[in-house]
Amino acid sequence: FVGSRGLGDVYKRQEENLKSWIEYRSNIWRFTGAEEPLRRMSKSNQNLYSFRFDWDEEASTILGDYPLFLGAAHGLEIPFISGDYSLVPAYARPLVFPNESKEGREYLSNLMMQYWANIAKYGDPNTFVQDHRWNKFRIQNQNYLRLDSPEYIQMVYDPVDADEMLKTLESDSTLELKERCLIGWIAEMNFVEEMRGDPPFDFCSEYTSVDLLKLRRLTEGRD
């Protein structure tokens, strides 16, 4: 039997674990899917723009903490760009787009539609946009526009530092050893610009690439 305090501790541990997992995987994805390609393209193209979709105003109910479990999920930006929230199935819409988020998400959606239309028509997202200027990507600061609830829309300057991320990961107590090794292994395979010859960490030597591949498939629900 676990007392209420014990249950709370267990939930907190699970929440911290999930948040850490999401943060590391998101940073790996941002590094490989945005920052690295932009750095390469910027050598011959100065008309580049980078964004991060961060909207996570889903409902938090007894059915689940959807801002945590779903958050700014891959593909969720499409209803905002198109202005068509019916792209999300009707049964899920009250959880993904609760009424209390309507004002903020419609503001964000209108802004995103302006940006995308302006890029297509003028090559500049800021044409006729009054607020929230979207600055060009510059390799010196590797800036991106955070697309979120109105009060959080801003230019951000915090590129992923591969070495620093792996250093933090090594001692992250919110993750089990095998989880840290798995994330480090995924990062090593994806950080092409930062390719290293050695395994991510010495203390991961007990896990082979085959072990980590099996763990990844299990984690991603492919086994």
Spans of features found by a protein language model:
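Single conserved hydrophobic/aromatic residue that forms the stacking wall/gate
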Residues: 1-11
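Mobile gating loops/cap/lid regions near enzyme active sites that modulate substrate access
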Residues: 32-223
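Surface-exposed cleft-lining segments at the edges of enzyme active sites
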Residues: 18-25
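Helical cap/lid subdomain of alpha/beta-hydrolase-fold lipid enzymes
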Residues: 25-33
